[in-house]
Amino acid sequence: MKIAVTGGYSSGKSSVSAVLTTLLDCFFISADIACKNELQVGATGWQQLKELWGPDYFSEDGEVDREAVREKIFLDPASKKELEAILHPLAHRQIVDAGLRADVCDKHLVAEIPLLFESDQSYDFDMVIVVSVAEDIAISRAMRRDDVRASLATSIIASQLPLAIKEARADFIINNDGLFAATYSQILFFVADRIEKKK
């Protein structure tokens, strides 16, 4: 089974994905990690971004200035679209390849894709999990985890599809508002109800 894990900003997608990978015989891929890899010096995404934006967003040794890029894309919607137009197709290729490897090896695929519904890329998943969290909790967690200002966290959330729309498109919703023990119980139920029953 090919499973996508998505949700809002700082909702706990990585935590849910990590648990799933311990419970399932699966391959795992993260769209965020795939995109970060594409911004490593010399990678295809890095080359395309440097050609598009020039040297101002790169350090002297060629590294992408991630903080400067983050500020730019969330203050300038056009820049965000430019970056996504570079990275999303490259990440998509990696995710599709991971799915093919999973098929060959008769394993599940767990793919963490934060912008699954916002992306123009087409995917073929058997199950889409949306990790849901209240906006005030997401902002608080983002400020602790990413050391960002509340205003930036709010703008990131506003730049994505409303959570209600994501939930409406989900095959399964995991609420992560409270203690992670409650979240873990929901993941166990998902595995038992949506995967084990289908064997």
From Swiss-Prot:
UniProt subcellular location: Cytoplasm
Cytoplasm in keyword set: yes
Keyword terms: ATP-binding, Coenzyme A biosynthesis, Cytoplasm, Kinase, Nucleotide-binding, Transferase
Gene3D superfamilies in the cross-refs: P-loop containing nucleotide triphosphate hydrolases
Enzyme class at the top of the EC tree: transferase
Pathway the protein acts in: Cofactor biosynthesis; coenzyme A biosynthesis; CoA from (R)-pantothenate: step 5/5
Enzymatic reactions: 3'-dephospho-CoA + ATP = ADP + CoA + H(+)
Binding site for ATP: 10-15
Domain of life: Bacteria
EC number: 2.7.1.24
Chief location bin: cytoplasm
UniProt xrefs under Pfam families: CoaE
Family named by the database record: Belongs to the CoaE family.
Protein function: Catalyzes the phosphorylation of the 3'-hydroxyl group of dephosphocoenzyme A to form coenzyme A.
UniProt-recorded name of the protein: Dephospho-CoA kinase
Organism annotation: Desulfotalea psychrophila (strain LSv54 / DSM 12343)
Gene: coaE
